[in-house]
Amino acid sequence: MQGCEPPAQIHSQTYTGIPPETQPQNQTGTETHRKNHSLPARYARRLGLLAFDIETTGLNPATHVVTAACVFGEGAEETFLFKGESEADDARSRERFLALLDAAPRLCAFNGIRFDIPFLHTAWGVPAERVEGWVLKTFDVYEACKLGLNATFSLNRLLSANGLESKSGSGLHAITLAHSRQWDALGAYCMQDTRLTYLATLQDSIALPVLSHASKRQIVIDRTTRTLFRVW
C-alpha cells in the first residue's frame, strides 16, 4: 500500500533508498565490485531479493490495522491475511511474515521506507532496532527519488514508464475489500503489488516518470554502472 509520510522517524542513519552495499561508490575495481558482477547483473540482483507489501484499513497506524501482507522473490511467494477472527492465527501469520523480512538478505518495496515499515513498527509494536535492520537492506525506488530528486510518483506511473503491467486497483480499493471481507481478492491485490514491485526493481535501468529540469529528458536509475541517476 502506498501511503503518506511515516508517523514517526524510525531510523537515525542517513538513507538514500538504496542499501549501502548496492549504492554507487566513487572508487571502482574493488574485489567486492568484481564478485558482485561475476554473474549477469539481473541474476545477481535476484539472489536473496525479497519484495514485500502490506495493506491496511487506513493511514494511521495508531487507529488502523494491517489486513494483508505479501512477500515475493525467487522461490518465495506468500500471502498473509489478518482477518481478526483468531488472534492465534493472526499472531502466527504476523511472526512468519516478520521472520521472512528478518531472514531476507535484501528487501525491496515501493514507499516501504515511509509507509509500510513505520506502520508495522507502530501498529505491531516491532522494536526500532528490528525495523532499522529492514530499512538498511531495502531498495526503495520511491524513497531514492524522494531524497535524491525531490520527486514522487505512483507505482502505476513507474510500471508504465518501464513497460510493465499496471496495477488492478488502489489502496482505497484494498480498504473496501477488507471492509467487505473479500479476503481472496484482497490477497490477490496485495500480491500483485508485491510482484510488480519486484519486477520493477530487477530492471537493469529503471526508467522514472521524472524529467530532467535542464534537458527535459527522462531520468533513470542505472543498475549496470555505478551511477545512481542519469538522463536517458
Give names to the regions the model predicted.
Residues 1-48:
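N-terminal accessory regions of nucleic-acid-interacting proteins
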Residues 6-11, 23-25, 55, 66, ...:
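RecB-family 4Fe-4S metal-dependent nuclease core
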Residues 53-55, 140, 193:
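Acidic active-site catalytic centers that drive phospho-/nucleotidyl reactions
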Residues 60, 115-119, 198:
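Short catalytic/ligand-binding loop motif for oxyanion handling, primarily in non-cytosolic enzymes
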Residues 61, 113, 148, 186-193:
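Aromatic-acidic/polar surface patches that form glycan- and anion
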Residues 79-154:
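Conserved DEDDh/DEDDy metal-dependent 3′-5′ exonuclease domain
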Residues 158, 163-222:
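Acidic, Mg2+-coordinating catalytic module of metal-dependent nucleases/exonucleases
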